[in-house]
Amino acid sequence: VFGAGIAIGVYFENSRSSSIQDLYYDYEITVSDVSASLDILSSSNLSCTETWNNLLTLNDNVYNTAVKLEKYDASNKITDELIVLHKRYDLLRTILWQQFILAKNKCGEQRNTIVYLYQYKDPSINTRGFQTAMSNYLTDLDNKYPDKIVLIPIAADLNVISLDLMTKLYGVKGYPVVVVNEKYKFENLSSLSSIESYLKLNIENSKTNSRSF
């Protein structure tokens, strides 16, 4: 029985190591794709529509790959190895956030950026519950307005220097928080419904402005 227990333990440890290795492989492919794509975007004369479409595709690819990591997080103890891997994905998302800002400055606000900054390491029980509610609300919002918003979730407590600089630039002082269009911050459950109210107003204003040309 003791020998069988050791064998089972070794099997699960090997399986865990293999899963993490697969996540690293996925990350390496994703970061290479993002890097090459951004180089092409910066050196080409793509139209604004093409630029936005490419950035949206990259954001979707990063999100879909990171979902695997989130599922692994949910079923395993958070280790230093997982934190490092998560930090790499959060850096990618920060880079994409920067690129969306550049695209808006160049081409206009074709989408509303909704950046969800949350606690990853050791959130309290209350914070964990709050973040679950916030995440569910934003997911529903993303499904309701799929062609109007860009949702970018980023763990904000992993010491990503570029992210820390951006949060200081936009006056973010605590987490979790939702930053909409780099202008408005929503920090509690009672303010979440205001996000949709703002989006509706902004979408309507965009329609009015487009009709005036």
Predicted regions and their residues:
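Non-globular targeting/processing and membrane-anchoring segments
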Residues: 1-113, 123, 127-130, 139, ...
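Loop/turn elements at helix/coil->beta-strand transitions in domains of secreted/extracellular proteins
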Residues: 111-112, 146-150, 174-175
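Soluble periplasmic/extracytoplasmic beta-strand elements of cell-envelope proteins
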Residues: 113-117, 177-179
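Thiol-based oxidoreductase modules, predominantly thioredoxin-like and allied folds used
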Residues: 116-120, 146-161
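Short acidic, S/G/P-rich loop/turn micro-motifs used as interaction or catalytic elements
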Residues: 121-125, 159, 184-186
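Solvent-exposed, polar/charged alpha-helical surfaces in well-ordered, non-transmembrane soluble domains
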Residues: 136-140, 193, 197, 201
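C-terminal regions of proteins
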Residues: 164-170
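A short, hydrophobic beta-strand/beta-hairpin element that forms part of a small beta-sheet core
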Residues: 173-188
